[in-house]
Design a protein with these regions (language model features):
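Interfacial juxtamembrane loops and adjacent helix segments
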Residues: 40-121, 349-371, 514-515
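Catalytic lumenal/periplasmic loop and adjoining terminal transmembrane helix
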Residues: 26-32, 75-76, 255-260, 265-284, ...
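Transmembrane signal-anchor helices characteristic of membrane glycosylation enzymes that use polyprenol
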Residues: 10-42, 47-48, 57-64, 150, ...
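Hydrophobic, aromatic-rich transmembrane alpha-helices
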Residues: 130-132, 295-331, 335, 339, ...
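Membrane-interface transmembrane helices that cradle and orient dolichyl/undecaprenyl
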Residues: 137-139, 178-194, 204, 226-229
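Transmembrane-helix motifs of polytopic, lipid-linked glycan transferases
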Residues: 114, 118-139, 177, 181
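Hydrophobic/aromatic-rich transmembrane helices and adjacent perimembrane loops
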Residues: 161, 168-171, 204, 213, ...
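Signature aromatic-anchored transmembrane alpha helix within multi-pass, membrane-resident enzymes
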Residues: 9-19, 219, 253, 325-335, ...
Length: 627
């Protein structure tokens, strides 16, 4: 029966099963946390960026559609699809607050959080399906599409980020789909894929300016496809495809700009916003000469195709066609060596004695003051390597290594389809290398959110590796292939249980427990509030929290962060409980030192180590009893 199952039926059944797991894992937690900056998006039910965007459309206040410099419009659109339907009369669900002390309505906030998050979560589930379908159109390999969907649906980090009301939540999904749609275009030459890629790229740029990296990657795709896919064609065919690739690239750019401007009309009123959200993205000052060079090459190449009938370019590509395998081998070696170097550096402590910096320091002096390429590289690659499930990491490396060896990939794939797979591996590897190069150029230490575009790239490479490995098994023994797939999926799914329900804090077991690459960022606040809510007279208690995530779920009164210094002139003896976390204590170090000295009991009454890592903690203290 399994042998008779067609690829289409298999993909359909597999998709719904994986989608069911994705929904079952993620939906129950949507209303049980608040993370960094979400209060700026929707936590206040009468204002915030989501409300600002939808109100701007309602009142035709077009300038107000620019809600943030990210710009986060895609996030606001998806979050606002269900949130405002729930917030019919938000003011009726608030308690009285003042500048310092707030009182929340936990039941309301929990339900509102669910509605503001579910649109993003469902959209990303649909986009994972689209990614799987595009991979099927590109490779015609049902197993590859299945493994890709599985690794994406079962990724703790991607599930976690999809639960957030944050621009990064939609960056990875729209960006990956846009890239694959353009790959489908250069492979099949159908304009509908270019149109789809342009629309998706527009949504990517509306998510976050980091999506501008796709300008460079799609540019590379347009040219590299001529080498990897079309170098052996006739000169006339090569010329036709070359012109189509360039025009398709320009169409994608124009459509992305049109989508950007139409969904953020502020860009039509002030074109500066259009520039800053696309080509003039943050840090673009260093890339202006590169953009000019890219434009010059594009114009020169198009002129050669039109006026010289591709005599030079076809001859050059035909001569360079033997570089395809060396290029992929080079990328495979760079990535494999990078992963091995990262594992050697950190999996058994700081083996090489590198200088360290907090993973969330970004452009902080703790990182920028570090000298030495290898030290910086070890810090840059650490989050990606140690927050990727081991099964995915292993098969991603296997994908690049097996794909780089012609004899091995020919055994698993037909000649026609192996060219598409090799090209995909080249692009995915190029994205990773280009991303880290840009991070070095920007002097910024990337963490999980900053590098979110890389996780689907690694997952797709892992799917290629799994498909290549599976095709080495005898085709007549269907049970062996299904057994291999089941074991691999079970291994991957175990990662979901590791840090559940705090999926965005997932860290694999390759990193020692006393080390961290992620922070709570509001996780654990709900659990701390649930603990205090069960204590006697909690509704009359006053608590202080050093970070987001606690106050909205606490039944009593609450003070957050540094604002406590304004409470009764710095007299803290009325505060009953204190909620502390790693990130919060860094931000409120001096205040916490004063609180510990004056009023806080030395031992916590409740502790949560997220992922079993003591460095990623949430603790609750009570006030010290007077002597």
């Amino acid at each position: 029966m399994l042998r008779q199952l067609s690829p289409h039926h298999f993909l359909r059944i597999a998709f719904f099963a994986l989608l069911g797991i994705y929904l079952a894992v993620g939906l129950p937690h949507l209303g049980k946390f608040q993370t960094a900056d979400e209060d700026l998006w929707f936590a206040n039910p009468e204002e915030g960026r989501v409300h600002q965007y939808w109100d701007a459309w309602r009142h035709h206040a077009w300038e107000e559609t620019r809600i943030n410099d990210k710009p986060g419009v895609t996030t606001a659109i998806l979050s606002g699809m269900f949130g405002p339907l729930y917030d019919r009369h938000p003011s009726d669900k608030l308690k009285d607050n003042d500048f310092i002390v707030t009182s929340a309505h936990p039941a309301y906030f929990k339900e509102a959080s669910f509605f503001y998050r579910i649109g993003i979560y469902l959209a990303n589930g649909a986009l994972i399906w689209l990614i799987g379908w595009l991979l099927w159109r590109i490779t015609r390999n049902p197993w590859l599409s299945f493994f890709a969907a599985a690794f994406l649906f079962l990724s703790p980090i991607l599930i976690g980020v999809s639960q957030l009301v944050n621009p990064d939540a939609t960056l990875w999904s729209f960006g990956t789909a846009s890239l694959l749609a353009y790959v489908a275009f250069v492979l099949h030459g159908r304009w509908r894929y270019a149109i789809l890629s342009g629309a998706l790229l527009g949504m990517t740029l509306l998510s976050k300016y980091t999506g501008a990296i796709l300008f460079f990657l799609l540019y590379l795709t347009a040219f590299a496809s001529l080498l990897f896919l079309h170098a052996d064609t006739s000169r006339e065919t090569f010329r036709r495809i070359g012109i189509m690739n360039i025009l398709g690239y320009l169409l994608v750019l124009l459509l992305s700009l049109a989508v950007f401007a139409l969904l953020m009309p502020a860009a039509l009123i002030d074109p500066r916003y259009l520039w800053e959200g696309t080509f003039g993205f943050k840090g673009a000052a260093n890339t202006t000469p590169v953009l000019a060079l890219m434009g010059g090459i594009l114009l020169a190449f198009l002129s050669e195709l039109i006026f010289l009938k591709a005599r030079l370019s076809h001859t050059a590509m035909h001569a360079l066609r033997y570089l395809k395998t060396p290029l992929l081998i080079a990328i495979a070696c760079i990535i494999t060596a990078g992963v091995a170097f990262t594992l050697l550096s950190w999996s058994d402590g700081n083996r090489f004695g590198f200088e360290t910096a907090p993973f969330d320091t970004s452009r902080g002096s703790e990182y920028t003051s570090i000298q030495g390429f290898w030290n910086q590289l070890a810090l840059q690659t650490k989050p990606l390597v140690f927050t990727t499930p081991p099964a995915v990491l292993l098969f991603a490396l296997l994908g690049w290594l097996l794909g780089a060896i012609p004899a091995l990939r020919k055994h698993a794939l037909s000649n026609k389809h192996q060219h598409a797979v090799v090209f995909l591996l080249f692009l995915l590897g190029s994205l990773i290398i280009l991303f880290f190069y840009a991070a070095f150029e920007q002097h910024i230490l990337v963490h999980v959110r900053y590098s979110i575009l890389l996780y689907p790239a690694v997952a797709i490479a892992a799917a290629i590796g799994a498909a290549l490995a599976l095709h080495t098994l005898p085709k007549r023994h269907t049970w062996m292939r299904w057994g291999f797939a089941s074991i691999l999926l079970l291994w991957s799914a175990l990662s979901l249980a590791a840090d559940r329900p705090f999926h965005f804090n997932y860290t694999n077991d390759l990193l020692p427990r006393n080390d961290d690459v992620t922070g709570a960022w509001g996780y654990g606040g709900y659990e701390a509030a649930q603990f205090l809510n069960t204590r006697f007279f909690s509704e009359y208690a006053l608590a202080w929290s050093d970070y987001e995530g606690f106050c909205p779920f606490f039944h009593g009164r609450c003070i957050k962060g540094s604002i406590v210094k304004w409470y009764k002139g710095g007299d803290f003896k009325d505060i009953d409980y204190f909620v502390a976390s790693r990130r919060g204590l860094i931000r409120n170090e001096s205040i916490w030192r004063k609180l510990k000295r004056d009023v806080v009991h030395p031992e916590p009454i409740w502790t949560l180590y997220i992922g079993g890592r003591p460095g990623n903690f949430v603790e609750v203290y009570k006030k010290r009893e007077p002597l």
